[in-house]
Every structure is written in C-alpha cells, then in structure tokens.
A protein has these predicted regions:
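Active-site and adjacent substrate-binding regions of carbohydrate-active enzymes
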Residues: 1-389
C-alpha cells in the first residue's frame, strides 16, 4: 500500500500512532491499578524498531520521500532510536511534551501573566534538540488535537493577539528542525470557546461532560475547562473571508464558524501589510534566505528567565540571537554576550531598526527580535557553551 501511494507521486507519510504498532502478543493480565504503566505493553515494544527498519529498507529508502511519526509515549531518551539516520527508520518524530506543558507545570512567576512554566518549556525544547543531534527535530505548538496556538501560548485578547501570534511564528521559524503548522495559525485564529455542549463534536469533550453529570459533578466546570483546552477549538472551519461560513463552504459545516471570521480571515489579512499572515510570509522567506536558522546549532541563553526565551543559532560565520517575550508584560532578558556589534534583522513590532549595546535587554509584551551577530568573540563564547552542554 505504501508503494502504491509513492508511485502516485506523494512526498511522504505522517504515521499516526506509529510507536504503538508493536504489541505484546501474550496478552498478559494487568493489574488495573497499574493503568498508567501499561504503555510498556502496547507502546515501544522491542519489535517496533525491527518493523520500522523493515519499512525503511523495503519502501522508504526506495523513494525521495519524507517520513514523520506520531510519537505517542516516546520520551526524550527514546527519540534517537527513531530518527538517527544510521538506524534507517524515520526522518522525524514529533512528541507531546510541548502540548502537555500547560497541564503539567505551574507558572514560574504568577505575576508574569504566563500560566505555565516557561523555564520548563525552554528546558524541554533544549533537551529534545540535544537528543536528536544526529537526527532532525519536529517543532510545533498546535495541531488538530490541541487548542489554538495563539490562545494556548500567546494571548487571543485583541490587544495582544497579533503581537503574540507573530512572536510564536518567530519562535517556530527560528528553531532548528522542521516547523509544523496547523491551518489557521498563520492568520491568528483563536479558540471558539463554545458555551453549549451541543455545539461540540469532539468525543473526548462529550464523554468528559457525560462523566461529570453521571458522577454528580458540575458539568459547567467541564465546559469552562474545554473552552481553553478542548480540541474542537482548533477544528472550526478555516476562515477565508467575510462571506457566509467564512467562505469555507456553501453548505453547513461540521462545526460552527468562529464569529470572529468577519475580521480574522485571509482576505483581510492579505490586504494589510502589517497582518499576521504577511508577517508569516516574511519570516518564512527570512528563514529560507538564512540557512543558519534551519541547519545551525542551537544554544539556549538566560535559561532561568521566567518570561523570555533567548537562544543562539549558528553555522559557519553566521550567528543569530533570537529574543522572545512569551508574556503580556515587559520582560528583561540578560543574554550574557557582547551586543556591541549586533544589528536587528527582524522584529514583530516593526520599529526596531537598531539596539543600543547594553547588558540587559528590555522586551515589550510578546516582543520578538532577531539579531545578527558578527564578531570574533562569539566564536569562543559559543565554544564555551558547547563545553557546558
């Protein structure tokens, strides 16, 4: 079947739940109290890598193609087994640590306006980058199983939606690896936040609601929680223009269109040179024109900063400093490097033509800045970072 589609000319496969294809054929009895531990019986079973290697050897290696696997239950220590080119299995594998971060961590500083640990997020991306040093990372912040990217990691309030969407775009397109984009994030689509259970299609949301009612709990609490975390937030029709159903269909869509389609849509954003969509196009071109942002090494700076994410990308003589404020409040970042020869290449506010040399950099709410650094001191500085890592 894979050969059939490759012969038709497709470019690759996104392999759903690929880490679950090998099972324990003895079907052992498992203590129900150990439910969280049963991954070992249906995920990462030893024969999994034999199957993937066979798939590569017999099919994938015969075509100019791309393969990416969904890494359910795959931890950072396991990923190299999937993507190390020497093992001849997959090109890429995406994990769920980024998606879980808001549910598994507490804010570093509640006053920052960030409702998860940015320090943990930075550590997580850094560990995964290091783990696939011999392979290739997958970078994403949203997909069909997650709420909208700008609602989850930025702010969908009118004041900050465009700025935070542009900041997140800058992050994804300056990290090492292949960035994955979910349709609508390039125009800053937001969570729809349905008020009624009848408006939801997602079986997970519906089952949570039914379970709460059956157990005598407050079903409204489920609805309130799903407004922020529910998967249907990202599954509403794509917003093309201001026409009925956002120009997506002349029929009745599976979910209601987000009412904000009258001002968040492709047609309007294409006409606005300062829009999220045009910024997205600009940064895509910027990435293509600067290979260091694709293939360069990655080095985290100011790791314990609870508001900003600062890192270096480098290859050859080119060094770039990326500074991102993930919060709705001003942040001070201390990259710890000489900024005397730095110049601004890209910023999401659109008014940073230069930056005065200083030890501490003040970033405005959700600000993103990309600097180019060309100075001999950076060579020894980055070498020292390599030793620390």
């Amino acid at each position: 079947q894979m050969r059939f589609w490759f012969d038709k000319g497709i470019d690759g496969f996104r392999m759903d739940s690929i880490s679950l294809i090998a099972k324990d054929p003895s079907f052992p009895l498992i203590d129900s109290k150990k439910y969280p531990d049963i991954f070992s019986f249906y995920a990462k079973e030893p024969r999994l890598h034999l199957y993937l290697h066979e798939m590569n050897r017999q099919v994938l290696s015969k075509y100019d193609c791309m393969s990416v696997g969904e890494g359910s239950a795959v931890m950072v220590d396991d990923v190299a087994k999937f993507v190390d080119p020497a093992r001849e299995e997959l090109n890429m594998l995406y994990h769920f640590d980024a998606a879980r971060i808001r549910n598994t961590t507490l804010p570093d500083n509640p006053e920052s306006g960030i409702d998860y640990s940015l320090i943990a997020l930075k550590k997580m991306f850094t560990e995964w980058d290091k783990a696939v040093d011999k392979g290739w990372p997958s970078i994403y912040l949203g997909n069909h199983d997650q709420p909208r990217m700008v609602s989850r990691f930025g702010s969908d309030k009118d004041e900050f939606r465009a700025l935070s969407a542009k900041m997140l775009i800058t992050f994804l397109l300056t990290m090492r690896g292949t960035p994955y984009w979910f349709a609508g994030d390039e125009i800053g689509m937001r969570n729809i936040r349905f008020d009624r259970i009848e408006d939801y299609n997602d079986i997970d949301t519906i089952n949570r609601y039914k379970k709460a009612k059956a157990e005598g709990k407050d079903p409204q609490a489920v609805l309130d929680e799903q407004k922020e975390t529910g998967r249907d937030n990202a599954r509403t029709p794509f917003q093309w223009d201001r026409s009925p159903e956002a120009g997506f269909t002349a029929g009745t869509p599976w979910l209601k269109v987000n009412p904000d389609y009258t001002w968040i849509n492709v047609a309007d954003e294409e006409k606005d040179p300062t829009s999220i969509l045009n910024y997205f196009k600009k940064v895509v071109s910027f990435r293509k024109e600067n290979p260091s942002l694709i293939y360069g090494s990655y080095h985290l700076l100011d790791a314990e900063n609870p508001q900003s994410y600062t890192f270096l990308r480098k290859t050859g003589a080119d060094t770039y400093l990326i500074m991102l404020n993930f919060s709705p409040k001003a942040a001070i970042s201390t990259p710890g490097i000489d900024m005397s020869n730095a110049h601004v290449l890209l910023d999401n506010y659109g008014d940073r033509s230069h930056m005065a040399p200083q030890k501490d950099i003040t970033l405005r709410p959700f600000e993103a800045i990309v600097f180019q650094l060309n100075h001999p001191v950076y060579e020894s500085f980055i070498d020292s970072l390599d030793l620390l890592e």
